[in-house]
Amino acid sequence: MKQALLVKVLDKRLGNEIPLPAYATDGSAGLDLRACLAEPVTLQPGETTLIPTGMAIHLSDPGLAAMLLPRSGLGHKHGIVLGNLVGLIDSDYQGEVMVSCWNRGNEAFTISVGERIAQMVIVPVVQVGFEIVDDFDDSSRGAGGFGSTGTK
């Protein structure tokens, strides 16, 4: 099922010289976001910078949010991940989508104009209210945390 997403193009190169965000394959969960830079940016080891995507989005549906995730190849091969590890865009946000890129690697890395820098996944959201209780119903796991279910 495809649903329309309101996108405002802020950089006129987007959709022309720089492709619009797109799914790489029919089975892709994430849209590839691209760097809308005036010129390439070199990230030194340990450095973080905000990279513009050239677009603003407005999800408008409180039952949706957008998550920004790193591209696995950039992280594994070059140490380029998101500075905030995961980005979360609320349904009522209408500003430019920026990607915080962090070079956690040992070598400088240059981000080229139009390079795919992150993935955006649209996810359902359920807003909850709290109900105060004295106890929970029993479960097989109980209060077991960190490693309590074993390694096998």
Swiss-Prot record:
Chain positions recorded as substrate binding sites: 71-73, 84, 88-90, 98
One GO term of the biological process aspect: dUMP biosynthetic process
Cofactor(s) recorded in Swiss-Prot or TrEMBL: Mg(2+)
Annotated Gene3D superfamilies: 2.70.40.10
Alphabetical UniProt keywords: Hydrolase, Magnesium, Metal-binding, Nucleotide metabolism
Pathway: Pyrimidine metabolism; dUMP biosynthesis; dUMP from dCTP (dUTP route): step 2/2
UniProt key word Secreted: no
GO MF term set: dUTP diphosphatase activity; magnesium ion binding
Recorded catalytic activity of this chain's protein: dUTP + H2O = dUMP + diphosphate + H(+)
InterPro entries (alphabetical): dUTPase (IPR008181), dUTPase-like (IPR029054), dUTPase-like_sf (IPR036157), dUTPase_trimeric (IPR033704)
UniProt xrefs under Pfam families: dUTPase
Residues of the signal peptide: none
Record-listed E.C. numbers: 3.6.1.23
HAMAP family documented for this protein: dUTPase_bact
Family statement drawn from the similarity comment of this UniProt entry: Belongs to the dUTPase family.
Protein role: This enzyme is involved in nucleotide metabolism: it produces dUMP, the immediate precursor of thymidine nucleotides and it decreases the intracellular concentration of dUTP so that uracil cannot be incorporated into DNA.
Listed name of the protein: Deoxyuridine 5'-triphosphate nucleotidohydrolase
Gene: dut
